[in-house]
Amino acid sequence: MVKTEIPDAGRKLPPLSPAVFYILFALAEGEKHGYAIMKEAETVSGGQFTMGPGTLYTTIQRLLELGLIEETSTSSDSERRRRCYRLSGSGSQVFEAELNRMESLVRSAQRRKLVPRDGG
């Protein structure tokens, strides 16, 4: 497959889909296998976001092709082989850019008094 180029970190990217965001979020803390990514997405979203294996692995394949994540050496858990994944340098930049975009939206909403500020 042809690898799609990721824009430079300084360029604006469209908002990430929830599946992409939560996969990158889960991998920001370190290498994980697919099931651990699914569980982490559910945990960090407070149960608001769940994804099935079809969505997970289709999205993982796309992120691999884009170079946002990398497959690491396969781990062996009790004779079961699992593929593990980690963020690439580009993936870290894209995840950080998305967090900055979200933070900017929250600040804008607070300035417009659409949501309360922290602690008040």
Language-model segment annotations:
Residues Q93-G120:
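Amphipathic alpha-helical dimerization/coiled-coil segments
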Residues L56-L63:
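Basic amphipathic alpha-helical segments that dock to polyanions
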